[in-house]
Curated annotation (Swiss-Prot):
Disulfide bridge map: none
Family: Belongs to the AB hydrolase superfamily. Hydrolase RutD family.
Keywords: Hydrolase
Organism: Enterobacter sp. (strain 638)
InterPro entries documented for this protein: AB_hydrolase_1, AB_hydrolase_fold, AB_hydrolase_sf, Pyrimidine_utilisation_RutD
Protein name according to UniProt: Putative carbamate hydrolase RutD
HAMAP family on file: RutD
Residue ranges constituting the AB hydrolase-1 domain according to the UniProt record: 14-123
Catalytic activity field: carbamate + 2 H(+) = NH4(+) + CO2
Gene3D superfamilies given in the database record: alpha/beta hydrolase (3.40.50.1820)
Length: 270
């Protein structure tokens, strides 16, 4: 699997690995790259079955497969230890990596993630799947921004929304791959496994996330006693895209705390 590595800003710079959500594209993290690359060597990648790692995914594809193929790609690149920053599905992959490879994962940042699929999120995906079956890729792509962005933010950026729609349609991962990746997402359940996450964890969520209610991050925070939860008042599911200045400040401060504070952080900030 192909991955992209930025030049290290200094010798022995720590490595952060960015994992996108269901869309799978490494470009999702573009608003964070410039800030992160000043302090870290950054790994971005398109997930298996998407972008420049396209190809038909097998039946029974799992979250474990997603974590294992990324871990192997990192080892092949000479990266045995790293910090994970994951959004939604990417946060789940990060949890899986932290459990399966505890010596490799230095710290973990979960953005709008969850322990197990919330009933509201399941309902959203059921609606989106019906759109996919009824209207194909066009309907899926047209509906996607409604679950990602706040209404006012979208309304002020109509040309951008049209451009994003055209780009997403041109690079659509394919119905089979999408459904297999979505099934892996829906089947993931960390309620019994969270106790095996021993690395420092930062949790970031947005109160106006339409797709993943912020209560999911509250539950994740409760299951990871040493975690630090930060709540953004607005930004939607893709809060790192809609309010990158706020998000980047929270992320950089959180990373510094995770990597340099040897004691677990129990404070919840809002």
């Amino acid at each position: 699997m192909k991955i992209s590595l930025s030049p290290p800003p200094f010798a022995d710079a720590p490595v952060v690995v960015l994992i996108a959500g269901l869309g799978g594209s490494g470009s999702y993290w573009l608003p964070q790259l410039a800030a992160l690359e000043q302090e870290y060597q950054v790994v971005c990648y398109d997930q298996r079955g998407t972008g420049n790692n396209a190809g038909e995914l097998p039946h029974g594809y799992t979250l474990g497969n997603m974590a294992d193929e990324l871990y192997q790609a990192l080892l092949n690149a000479g990266i045995p230890r790293f910090t994970v920053i994951g959004h939604a599905l990417g946060a789940l992959v990060g949890l899986q990596l932290a459990i399966a490879h505890p010596d490799a994962v230095r710290a973990l940042v979960c953005v709008n993630g969850w322990l197990s699929l919330n009933a509201h999120t399941r309902r959203c995906f059921q609606i989106r799947e019906r759109l996919l079956h009824a209207g194909g890729a066009q309907a899926w792509v047209e509906a996607q921004p409604l679950f990602l962005y706040p209404a006012d933010w979208m309304a002020a950026r109509a040309p951008r929304m049209e451009a994003e729609e055209a780009l997403a349609l041109a690079h659509f991962q394919g119905t089979n791959n999408l459904q297999r990746r979505l099934l892996a997402l829906k089947q993931a359940d960390f309620r019994a496994q969270a106790k095996h996450v021993h690395c420092p964890v930062q949790i970031i969520c947005s109160t106006d996330d339409l797709l993943v209610p912020s209560v999911c991050s509250t539950e994740l925070h409760a299951a990871l006693p040493g975690s630090h939860k930060t709540v953004m008042r607005q930004g939607g599911h893709a809060c790192n895209v809609t309010d990158p200045d706020t998000f980047n400040a929270l992320l950089l401060n959180g990373l510094a705390s995770l990597m340099h504070n040897p004691e677990p952080v129990f404070k919840e900030s809002q």
